[in-house]
Amino acid sequence: MKNFKMTIAYDGRKYMGFSERKGNPDKAVQGKLEMILTKMYNTYVEVVSACNTEAGVHAKRQIVNFIAPEDTYDCDGVFEYFEKYLPDDIIILSVEIVDERFHSRYLVKSLSFEYRIWKHNAPRRPLFERHQVNVLNQVLNVKK
């Protein structure tokens, strides 16, 4: 059995977060990945993430891992299989085989988050960034 580490990115607008929602795997990034792995290996394969995200949150470089139940695919094979079946709003940036003890959640060393806020009455509305910002209609209390 191989332990695969993948770095992924996604546009979270259509998802209720990374973690699978019971009975509704299409609404979570984890659910999408696990559905593809289930198809790939003909058995359920769990995807573990370094962190969970909330609804609508995007990821630029999120680390996940899974244990392949058989040695059918190498890194290129895994990458190509995901490329074939992933929706346009999720991409695989890299795939590598790691030590069997690697666990993306328990071995995470750091997390970073970027919050982008647009003040509603600012001089110009963001055009290209409009799906990556939160619109704020009230005064932001930075001290709080």
Predicted region positions:
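Structured-RNA-binding interfaces characteristic of tRNA pseudouridine synthases
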Residues: 1-144
